[in-house]
């Protein structure tokens, strides 16, 4: 009897072994391991797939969430509302930045953030909402965006489990989740919908100003070589992982 695994990474690799091997060898032979052509090409291809203006790759999904909050320039003590049913990373980055996480329960039918409870949780210090699209199912983004507009709040979408999923508005317009709020984030952890062979992540935005901020923050706060204008982090997707993801995105 053969054991059927929920996630079989070895079998996934075997199905596309030659393509992956060639992609990795090309990067190694190029000597361009950080911010090389593979990273730029993957970014452009993912932006096209997501129908979003800017994709900024980073080291992992946790960093993506942290960088998104940093780009919004929230202040210590500001409140960020998110769901209590999510991976720890969603909440830990809020605490790491000396912000206050406000956890609310989920809708029992969708397991996504409960919009009625969300409204009740908004206070004078609330600055942002972080909905989590869980199990490939989008949160109610129409309501969330309406609430954010009424209360002047930022929206950061945690899209680690739903890349590629579409949300349909009442008007009939469809958008990929992760591209609806101010910033979207995702993870390329191996077991994710789109997973690399290590750690990786990305941020999405249609806002040009935020895209510039994010690109600097993920690269030590540099907007010009050796000119560090803001406090940043070292969070770059390496070229090997980008090449692997570039192979996978075409499947």
PLM segments and residue spans:
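N-terminal "arm"/small-domain region of PLP-dependent enzymes with the aminotransferase-like
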Residues: 1-32, 37
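Phosphate-binding glycine-rich loop
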Residues: 32-79, 93-97, 103-105, 170
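Active-site phosphate/pyrophosphate- and oxyanion-stabilizing loops and adjacent acidic/basic residues
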Residues: 44, 142-145, 174-175, 199
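PLP-dependent aminotransferase-like
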Residues: 70-166
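Hydrophobic/aromatic ligand-binding patch that stacks against planar heteroaromatic rings
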Residues: 92-94, 147, 176, 193, ...
């Amino acid at each position: 009897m053969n054991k059927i695994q929920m996630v079989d990474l070895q079998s996934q690799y075997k199905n596309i072994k030659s393509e992956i091997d060639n992609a990795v060898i090309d990067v190694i032979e190029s000597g361009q391991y950080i911010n090389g052509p593979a990273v730029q090409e993957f970014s452009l291809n993912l932006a096209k797939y997501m129908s979003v203006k800017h994709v900024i790759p980073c080291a992992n999904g946790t960093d993506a969430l942290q960088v998104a909050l940093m780009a919004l320039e929230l202040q210590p003590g500001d409140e960020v509302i998110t769901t209590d049913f999510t991976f720890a990373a969603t909440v830990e980055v809020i605490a790491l930045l000396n912000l206050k996480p406000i956890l609310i329960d989920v809708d029992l039918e969708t397991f996504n953030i409960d919009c009625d409870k969300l409204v009740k949780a908004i206070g004078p210090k609330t600055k942002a909402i972080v909905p989590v699209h869980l199990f490939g199912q989008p949160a109610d983004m129409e309501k969330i965006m309406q609430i954010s507009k009424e209360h002047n709040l930022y929206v950061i979408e945690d899209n680690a489990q739903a890349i590629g999923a579409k949300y349909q508005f009442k008007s009939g317009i469809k958008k990929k989740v992760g591209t609806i709020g101010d910033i979207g984030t995702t993870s390329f952890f191996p077991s994710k919908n789109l997973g690399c062979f290590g750690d990786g992540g990305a941020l999405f935005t249609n806002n040009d100003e935020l895209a510039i901020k994010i690109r600097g923050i993920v690269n030590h706060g540099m907007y010009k070589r050796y000119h560090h204008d803001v406090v940043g982090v070292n969070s770059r997707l390496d070229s090997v992982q980008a090449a692997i993801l570039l192979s996978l995105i075409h499947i």
